[in-house]
Amino acid sequence: MTTVTPMMAQYLEIKEAYADALLFYRMGDFYEMFFDDAVAAAEALDIALTKRGKHEGEDIPMCGVPVHAAEGYLLTLIRKGFRVAVCEQMESPAEAKKRGSKSVVRRDVVRLVTPGTLTEDALLEARRHNFLVAYAEVRSGAALAWADISTGDFHVMPVTRPRLSPELARLAPSELLVVDEPVFQQLRPLADDHRIPLTPLGKASFDSMAAEKRLCELYKVGSLEGFGTFARAELSAMGALIDYLDITQKGKLPLLQPPVQEAEDRVMQIDAATRRNLELTRSLSGERGGSLLSVIDRTVTPGGARLLEQRLGSPSRNLDVIHARLSALDFCIDHSTLAADLRAALRKTPDLDRALSRLALDRGGPRDLAAIRNGLGQAEAIAALCDGLELPGLIAGACADLNGFDELLGLLDTALVAEPPLLARDGGFIAPGYDSDLDEARELRDKGRGVIAGMQQKYAEHTGIASLKIKHNNVLGYFIETTATHAAKMLNPPLSETYIHRQTTANQVRFTTVELSELETRILNAGNHALEIEKRLYSSLSGAVLEQAARLNIAARGLAELDLATALADLARAENWCRPSVDPSRAFAIEGGRHPVVEHALRRQGGDPFVANDCDLSADKGAAIRLLTGPNMAGKSTYLRQNALITLLAQIGSYVPADSAHIGVVSQLFSRVGASDDLARGRSTFMVEMVETAAILNQADDHALVILDEIGRGTATYDGLSIAWATLEHLHATNRCRALFATHYHELTALAATLDGVENLTVAVKEWEGEVIFLHEVRKGAADRSYGVQVAQLAGLPPSVVARARVVLDQLEKSEREGGKQKALIDDLPLFSAAPPLPPPAPKTSPADAMLKEIHPDELTPRQALEMLYKLKEAAR
């Protein structure tokens, strides 16, 4: 059996403790991986797989990544579902030798990298939160706790098992913590649905008594009463989250703000299907482009962008909150010059939250200190812009949070250079004049370098070799270098008595002298001394910043609020949006409403302007349901979605794309539009539709807004009609909510005559010579046909198929009018015989074309030409 080397024995011991993670084992300038880790990482990273030695008679697979580029490789591995344990050298090889000639460099895991515990800019999306979530059940209660360790946000709320899916859809976390069996297995399908990595923890992590102690230690308090009254399940979820952070960060806990308790009735409830169907933050293809967020996001700071996405996912139901946000927008619109100045200052503001988090976890550097300095400088300028003005509450509060950092800003301004390096070990980030000991060490170091230049000139004259150079590398230090031709006389007396041979390369020979070695020692000592002073000063400055971390987090929140208010005001002004009226009623009256994403796309493509439409779903009591009929491609789905989006925008405190909008607060937003299957879970398109419809009928209350599109279309005609009919009746009688119901089942329109609160709407079209023109106007009334054949023709079906479809449709409609049996008709139709190809249809000519052919321009007077133009316009209608 092959003897295991001391280094490999150390590796195997560490790996055993982190069996479920890839081990990044530090060896000099590389992180090396061995055995199965190497095989998996090489495939995931597309890097070379090599071997190093043998273990139990087999070659040991090995691969590695350079330390300086490790972040990029880490990101790839995390995105592919791996967890990575980072094992660093805790001492230098020289220090290890002091313990014995055969001692292995001491190593230890300093961090476990998982999807929910990322902090580096390179591993995160600057404009999105990265939430770690813990779910706990204690007796009959359950709770959800979530934190973003890169910003310090920390929240908790009670949640029932049925409400877990909508909340996960709202938060879109990167990792979900649950207790091991049986909850882990029970929630695995849900986590898979949301594509969230699921991490099991032992029961001890979820112990609520231990959790309370953990939280008190974290916040250095004797009791949590100052933060609120927490249920046992809430304590359990928070405690598990803190315990996991302690495990992954190896005892270096992040700066978490005091936990904010949230209530279910605080925000509009939106389930996962509705978020997906409305494309709030991601399009159906999973991209940011094409989503509502991509169209309305005009924020200029990462913090403002994160706040916007958070608001979009959690529209408020609190009228005071909504009105405060709208008042802030009113102010920014009325004071457009001030708002523009604020946005200009905000553009220069770094990400304070994430800089603070890295400093707290000891992963920061001088640039994070500079980010705090620059951010505080901009905060001071922003507060000065608003000084002396009568401000609305939200903006006044945000500006007040930016003051009181004069001492810290002065310290950082004095201590740091303008553009510091990324890492403290690089040195050169402390400004001259800040520390006298540092200035002295630097002067000695720099003077020594000047002496080197003079020494090179002296040696060139002494040897008579004009091309002689003094150079430096990390192996030899300073050395004298000359060509092999010139080196001959330096290798022989008398010069050999002064110049000591060090190394010969292919083209060069290198020497040193006693004088040069002594000078190098002085320079090296001075340089090392200067770097040690800088590192000490870095620790001191970091400590000064972290002492004010809580206030800095509040200031960062204030900057984000200002960014979001000015961004939404800029959007409203540029897009001609209106201020919505939001109250506790069940009103829903929108005039000239538009779909923000579709309107944006039409404008970008240079197409026709968006056709605005009204929507009135107001109801004092009982249901208010609008039954929408009309052909495909007419804009029914767009109309449904735009009214849902207008509601959502109003309740995040934004202006809305309409001429006017009066909206009674919506408690729940449900959307059943579009068609998709779920092959992984064995669900057909129709089954998915029914599951989503069931959720709506079982959950919607009388303040909900429901939009339903084509219920029942995925099955046989009478089955589908029956389901749609019963669904509409249930919405009317039981849910008693506000709803838009689009359908091709024209039989449903008869319900408007029998059910109070149900009215018919239709999307107008115009027929001309067998073709259909979509007007995209929603009017009162019901459609009597769907124009499916015309839409098929527009889609490019072969002319023979379109013609055959017209024949079949005409005969089916005739049979229905005459009361004939459908089967007899079908038997008469040669449906399974191929129709012969039809000749291409003759091009249609309009009356205007005929008139144009009869015109002789040279024979017309100007007056006759003008009259003819009016006639042509009339004929073209």
UniProtKB/Swiss-Prot annotation:
UniProt-annotated binding residues for ATP: 630-637
Its job: This protein is involved in the repair of mismatches in DNA. It is possible that it carries out the mismatch recognition step. This protein has a weak ATPase activity.
Matching Pfam families: MutS_I, MutS_II, MutS_III, MutS_IV, MutS_V
GO terms (BP aspect): mismatch repair
Keyword hit for Protease: no
Family to which the UniProt record says this protein belongs: Belongs to the DNA mismatch repair MutS family.
Domain of life: Bacteria
GO molecular function, one term: ATP binding
One Gene Ontology term, aspect cellular component: cytosol
CDD domains for the chain: ABC_MutS1
Keywords: ATP-binding, DNA damage, DNA repair, DNA-binding, Nucleotide-binding
InterPro entries registered for this protein in UniProt: DNA_mismatch_repair_MutS (IPR005748), DNA_mismatch_repair_MutS-lik_N (IPR007695), DNA_mismatch_repair_MutS/MSH (IPR017261), DNA_mismatch_repair_MutS_C (IPR000432), DNA_mismatch_repair_MutS_clamp (IPR007861), DNA_mismatch_repair_MutS_core (IPR007696), DNA_mismatch_repair_MutS_N (IPR016151), DNA_mismatch_repair_MutS_sf (IPR036187)
UniProt-listed NCBIfam families: mutS1, PRK05399.1
Designated name of the protein: DNA mismatch repair protein MutS
Coiled coil regions, renumbered to chain: none
